[in-house]
């Protein structure tokens, strides 16, 4: 990243707590973070540190108790639920530890599904899905359902699905957590290459310090507070 790198997503003073009767649990505490266009950012931390909650808030899958989240300057939590859903479909991609592929659909259909939901031409969506699957090395597995794919192959399908609508930002929650070391390395290589090819930003929540160390920036989450671990850019700092 360069000094002129443009901000894509800004998390401003975000806090999150839950109430259970008279007990209040603070999950996030005044988090500030800028994600830049095209960068790869890792957030590491122990279970329960708040990193997945932060990722969900960034993706409008959970609501902050306080604070602001801006995507290209648009305040996500001042929008209607319909507009939020549109942003999730068009501007955001999601990858999870457990791929969440639809079991009755083939690999190509799973990848094309977000494009179908967007209302794109079905024939073109399938062409785009085929191209992405070929890009991640699965051109020979287009018509296989998830049960016929290995764990690494299913995760590659999930990565292709996350990219089908050419999102500005992909949010990945433990994308290598269910894979062996070799498959995990392959997933990272694909993230890096696809980020460079499409200019997509990636935020990856992970326990995998080896994976995190390869990203442009590495932050750690502890007790709901973000801290800088490493950055390859002079702009790569949490505010």
From Swiss-Prot:
| Stored Pfam families | ABC_tran (PF00005)
Q: Does the keyword Membrane apply?
A: yes
Q: What PROSITE patterns is this protein classified in?
A: ABC_TRANSPORTER_1, ABC_TRANSPORTER_2, LOLD
Q: Does the keyword Transport apply?
A: yes
Q: Name one GO cellular component term.
A: plasma membrane
What EC designation does it have? Answer: 7.6.2.-
What domain of life does the native source organism fall in?
Answer: Bacteria
How does this protein lie in the membrane? Peripheral membrane protein
Q: Which residues bind ATP?
A: 45-52
Name the Gene Ontology biological process terms.
lipoprotein localization to outer membrane; protein localization to outer membrane
- Give start and end of each ABC transporter domain: 9-239
Keywords on record: ATP-binding, Cell inner membrane, Cell membrane, Membrane, Nucleotide-binding, Translocase, Transport
Recorded GO molecular functions are: ATP binding; ATP hydrolysis activity; transmembrane transporter activity
> Matching Gene3D superfamilies, A to Z?
P-loop containing nucleotide triphosphate hydrolases (3.40.50.300)
* Primary location recorded for the protein, binned into one broad class: membrane
Query: Matching SUPFAM superfamilies, A to Z?
Result: P-loop containing nucleoside triphosphate hydrolases
Matching InterPro entries, A to Z?
AAA+_ATPase, ABC_transporter-like_ATP-bd, ABC_transporter-like_CS, ABC_transpr_LolD-like, LolD_lipo_ATP-bd, MacB-like_ATP-bd, P-loop_NTPase
Query: Where in the cell is the protein located?
Result: Cell inner membrane
User: What family is this protein classified in?
Assistant: Belongs to the ABC transporter superfamily. Lipoprotein translocase (TC 3.A.1.125) family.
Q: What does the annotation say about its assembly with partners?
A: The complex is composed of two ATP-binding proteins (LolD) and two transmembrane proteins (LolC and LolE).
The record describes the protein's role as: Part of the ABC transporter complex LolCDE involved in the translocation of mature outer membrane-directed lipoproteins, from the inner membrane to the periplasmic chaperone, LolA. Responsible for the formation of the LolA-lipoprotein complex in an ATP-dependent manner.
Name the chain's protein: Lipoprotein-releasing system ATP-binding protein LolD
Task: Give the organism the record lists.
Answer: Shewanella frigidimarina (strain NCIMB 400)
């Amino acid at each position: 990243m360069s000094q002129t790198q443009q901000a894509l997503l800004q998390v401003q003073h975000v806090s999150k707590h839950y109430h259970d009767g008279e007990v209040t649990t603070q999950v996030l505490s005044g988090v500030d973070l800028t994600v830049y266009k095209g960068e790869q950012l890792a957030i590491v931390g122990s279970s329960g540190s708040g990193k997945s909650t932060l990722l969900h808030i960034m993706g409008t899958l959970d609501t902050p108790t306080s604070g602001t989240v801006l995507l290209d300057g648009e305040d996500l939590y001042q929008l209607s639920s319909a507009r939020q859903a549109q942003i999730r479909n068009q501007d955001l991609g999601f990858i999870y530890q457990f791929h969440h592929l639809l079991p009755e659909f083939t690999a190509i259909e799973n990848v094309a599904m977000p494009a179908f939901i967007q209302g794109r031409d079905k024939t073109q969506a399938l062409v785009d899905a085929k191209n992405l699957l070929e890009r991640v090395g699965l051109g020979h597995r287009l018509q296989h359902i998830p049960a016929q794919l290995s764990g690494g192959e299913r995760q590659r399908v999930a990565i292709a699905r996350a990219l089908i609508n050419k999102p500005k930002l992909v949010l990945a929650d433990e994308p290598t957590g269910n894979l062996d070391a070799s498959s995990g390395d392959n997933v990272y290589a694909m993230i890096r290459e696809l980020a460079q090819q499409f200019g997509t930003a990636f935020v990856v929540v992970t326990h995998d310090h080896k994976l995190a160390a390869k990203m442009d920036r590495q932050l750690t989450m502890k007790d709901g507070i973000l801290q800088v671990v490493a950055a390859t850019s002079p702009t790569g700092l949490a505010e």
